[in-house]
């Protein structure tokens, strides 16, 4: 298995799909990295040479991925919560942020129903 950005990339998948195993790399970014490295999208990871894998490592290293990206996202959310802005308050209360209704629905974000005590 090839190891890129600290992640074991699946060998038997096409290179476009295999690169999406890295957090922060989707199909579009995967295609861009492959085009920059000059590797065909249909080639499987197991068929790549060590030099080509090194090119992929360099291409992926240009982006914020994996732990750094997760940390950046969590710090952004923490910043919103510390500011006390509307979005930060909604994060703190575990409610939807983007204007969805909450009288009904929003069960995923709010969690299971709480029984009414009489």
Swiss-Prot record:
Sample GO molecular function, one term: structural constituent of ribosome
Superkingdom of origin organism: Bacteria
Keywords associated with the record: Ribonucleoprotein, Ribosomal protein, RNA-binding, rRNA-binding, tRNA-binding
GO biological process: one example: translation
Keyword Hydrolase: no
GO cellular component terms, semicolon-separated: cytosol; small ribosomal subunit
Gene3D superfamilies with a match to the protein in the record: 1.10.8.50, 30s ribosomal protein s13, domain 2 (4.10.910.10)
Pfam family, one: Ribosomal_S13
InterPro entries according to UniProt: Rbsml_uS13_C, Ribosomal_uS13, Ribosomal_uS13-like_H2TH, Ribosomal_uS13_bac-type, Ribosomal_uS13_CS
Family the entry assigns: Belongs to the universal ribosomal protein uS13 family.
Subunit architecture: Part of the 30S ribosomal subunit. Forms a loose heterodimer with protein S19. Forms two bridges to the 50S subunit in the 70S ribosome.
Protein name: Small ribosomal subunit protein uS13
Lineage: Bacteria, Pseudomonadati, Pseudomonadota, Gammaproteobacteria, Vibrionales
């Amino acid at each position: 298995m090839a190891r890129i950005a600290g992640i074991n990339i699946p060998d038997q998948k096409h290179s476009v799909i295999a690169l999406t195993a890295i957090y922060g790399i989707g199909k579009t970014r995967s295609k861009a990295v492959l085009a920059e490295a000059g590797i065909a999208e249909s080639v499987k990871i197991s068929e790549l040479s060590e030099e080509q894998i090194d090119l992929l490592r360099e291409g992926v290293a240009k982006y914020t991925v994996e732990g750094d990206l997760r940390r950046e996202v969590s710090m952004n959310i923490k910043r919103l919560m510390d500011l006390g802005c509307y979005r930060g308050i909604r994060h703190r209360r575990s409610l939807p942020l983007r204007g969805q209704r909450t009288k009904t629905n929003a069960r995923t974000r709010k969690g299971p129903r709480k029984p009414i005590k009489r």
